Design a protein with these regions (language model features):
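Hydrophobic packing positions in regular secondary-structure scaffolds
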Residues: 1-189
Length: 189
């Protein structure tokens, strides 16, 4: 079958062949590979085609493969996926999620998080490094950042606020409801 033929080809040619295929067909092939090999091939592709293939993988196949990818290559593919990239981020193991978000320029990470619902964003940012979370939140609208902080656990939300300047934190907290704001501010040193 196609998978066996691709595996028999020189490894450096395979990513080029996959990106010329219909992404659905390429995803069907990639899903049947050993996760490490699939990850290797995807990260050798430009972000757009790699992201297109990731869109057509089922959640369990995506999880098996992306958790073995290089954080920078994965981050670029996730960014190229647009709104579909949010679900990939949500499914990453915690350490890889932190590595992906911190390896991308903060504006790129922010643009990915901006596409997420506030619940999805809170779920993702609770697991990110506090400094990364702070940087991302400061690049969102203060209203969206406030919504996300209210949905995060108090400890992680407080850690993110502690990594912001006083003026940045105040510009976000002013849009929060009183009770969640008080809970989070109690966590600050």
């Amino acid at each position: 079958d196609a998978r066996e033929i691709l595996q028999a080809m020189p490894a450096d040619l395979v990513p080029g062949v996959l990106q010329q295929m219909d992404p659905k067909d390429a995803a069907a092939i990639v899903a049947g590979l050993q996760p490490a090999l699939a990850a290797e091939w995807l990260q050798q592709m430009p972000p757009g085609p790699a992201g297109d293939i990731l869109k057509y993988l089922g959640p369990s196949d995506t999880r098996r493969i992306v958790n073995r990818m290089d954080p920078v290559a994965l981050g670029n593919a996730v960014h190229a996926m647009g709104p579909d990239g949010v679900s990939v981020l949500r499914d990453l193991e915690d350490q890889l999620l932190r590595d992906v978000l911190s390896s991308l320029p903060i504006l790129v990470s922010s643009s990915i998080i901006e596409l997420a619902s506030s619940n999805e964003a809170a779920d993702i940012l609770e697991r990110a490094h506090p400094a990364t979370t702070a940087g991302i939140l400061m690049n969102l609208s203060p209203v969206k950042a406030a919504e996300i902080l209210e949905l995060m656990n108090d400890h992680n939300a407080g850690a993110a606020l502690a990594d912001m300047s006083v003026s940045s934190a105040a510009s976000i907290v002013q849009y929060m409801n009183v009770d969640p704001a008080a809970q989070i501010l109690r966590r600050l040193p």
